[in-house]
């Protein structure tokens, strides 16, 4: 009589239906566990429980957000640029000349607080593999960062680690970091936001999908060996709130190896070029559990896996640990039998470990409608036998309670228009410098200089300009521009309008460089979905983004939801970060945000300025105030301004263009002066304060040569965009004339205020 295995098997599960299981420790609710039992017709094995616990986690299943995210598809604009939409590892859009671009943004917030360097580094590695798994060569990365107060001890710990993690991983991969943003607010203390974006380029015919099709095809796991790092990351770190014990969660943070990922990229590109891959999936959150269930669910058959064949760094790992491990730099491919030897040879060439761990299986006629089975064995015994779609696609969907926060009306009524304003030109001058020097507005070179922005030689624009821009290939002048934006202050005041303002700012930033906005990705950072107030914010934010994208014809291609961004019961300000991608036909016609010191230039303000200070940088920096209504949103005005900027760039009318956002005209003028190393003199009109600090949307500052003034004014009239001549570029100072006075700040003084803040806080790099 053979000895009964010491591990949990399907046979043992059927024979011991009442055996207690630690499902609550794995983050599952009573009703979720009951549903698993109903699906299987028995209790799950411990390996099956591991799979369902991570695949049904908030991070992987979107169980609280799915009902709201559906409107991105339901309200999708009618466009022919979308080649692959929501549901795959990343969206893919047509950019012309037979080329496509894939891009996506994702969060690695919680791991980056627990272990800043590795958390941020593996965030970059994970999003790069998402892009790689679509069949594309990754060509650039970006990041959107939020931290607590810049002078707080915890920020002093977290920020340098996050920046070093992003820079070391991206630089080792040889990928330029072309842009992003950084913000500071007390609400992000102990809960930083680290959102990483990657963009890749491919030909239409080379798109790859996560699907396991073709019975008899091999399942190959390749890349790093599997270790204990990151076990339970999807459920432990990404699907629960922080508390005072968060540092104890350090073992759940993954460890990255960028040099191995670089080899993995080159290996995949050769595999794609030789047509050796049927389907492919990267291993990120939930590791082998996610890769096997999603590949099987996306295909036409089932899958049989021999878990013993998974290469291990630690031979002591249990089957459950192997399934939940989030070791980095791993991919899973479906390979036809007659191509297997060549596939393995390519992996060997790049020194990439590869192992055949299973095969695609056929389905019976009865199974065809609902898909095949995912069967896994360990030491010859079956430990998993489940319908993969139930784990990957059919997790719980919650209609969470929604309730407008009780303090929302009081917050809106607290109008910053009542705050004390500067009473003299000297005080106004001082406030311009204070806003310019604020940590979330000032020069971010302390951060961006640690990134290689120009490696690979195709970077056209990078920080500090309005968007990053990359030429897509050596044989074309076509390029893509990318910008990410988000403003938690606006979204706290009005999540619907605030999210549209974030989208509109990213849209303007892309248009300001001369690129046509095409598509959108998003990273939605919110507090606990179990809080009805947070769910109200989330519902309003998603509705706002869906409506805005529909209005301006830019489909949402995918993204990420990050819930539980809170410490105890204190949630962050809702922070949807919106990424907009645009295309420019000729990168030589790009427009920068810098005034030109060569020749004469005339400065114009495009768009309408109103007294709008709710959520503004002025109210925050000068008074520490958050209240009132955010700037109003007019999507028709945003579209019209975009057409002026894009057409003006194509006609080579514009010397510079810079959108107005945080800090209003004061910051925009100062930045254009600083980036060009030249001053300007402008007329602010009757109300200098409103002219300088209002944050009305749908505005930009542009400069043109004198001979193009009439053409610009005519172009604005054609599209119905208000236009006002402000002054001229020249001299060594930013000089602002108004009805009762004159303010002048030397460019050198602007530079000192703008560039000294972060080095003073964080030291020399």
Curated annotation (Swiss-Prot):
GO cellular component terms, semicolon-separated: cytoplasm
Q: Does the keyword Metal-binding apply?
A: yes
What subcellular compartments does it reside in? Answer: Cytoplasm
Q: Which CDD domains does this chain map to?
A: PurL_repeat1 (cd02203), PurL_repeat2 (cd02204)
E.C. numbers: 6.3.5.3
Name the UniProt key words of this record, in alphabetical order.
Answer: ATP-binding, Cytoplasm, Ligase, Magnesium, Metal-binding, Nucleotide-binding, Purine biosynthesis
Q: Residues that bind substrate, according to the entry? A: 107-110, 129, 254, 326-328, 562
Q: Does the keyword DNA-binding apply?
A: no
Family matches, as Pfam families: AIRS, AIRS_C, FGAR-AT_linker
Per the record, the GO terms for biological process are: 'de novo' IMP biosynthetic process
- Give the signal peptide, or none: none
- Which EC class does it fall in? ligase
- Listed binding positions for ATP are 62, 104, 522, 559
Q: Where does Mg(2+) 1 bind?
A: 106, 560
Q: Give the catalysed reaction(s), semicolon-separated.
A: N(2)-formyl-N(1)-(5-phospho-beta-D-ribosyl)glycinamide + L-glutamine + ATP + H2O = 2-formamido-N(1)-(5-O-phospho-beta-D-ribosyl)acetamidine + L-glutamate + ADP + phosphate + H(+)
A GO molecular function term, named singly, is: magnesium ion binding
Active site per database record: 59, 108
Q: Which domain of life is it from?
A: Bacteria
This protein's pathway reads:
Purine metabolism; IMP biosynthesis via de novo pathway; 5-amino-1-(5-phospho-D-ribosyl)imidazole from N(2)-formyl-N(1)-(5-phospho-D-ribosyl)glycinamide: step 1/2
Q: Tell me the residue numbers annotated for binding Mg(2+) 2.
A: 130, 282
User: Which parts of the chain are coiled coil?
Assistant: none
| Quaternary structure (record) | Monomer. Part of the FGAM synthase complex composed of 1 PurL, 1 PurQ and 2 PurS subunits.
According to its UniProt record, which protein family does this protein belong to? Answer: Belongs to the FGAMS family.
NCBIfam families membership = FGAM_synth_II (TIGR01736), PRK01213.1 (NF002290)
Q: Provide the protein name.
A: Phosphoribosylformylglycinamidine synthase subunit PurL
User: Whose protein is this, by species?
Assistant: Thermobifida fusca (strain YX)
Report the gene name.
purL
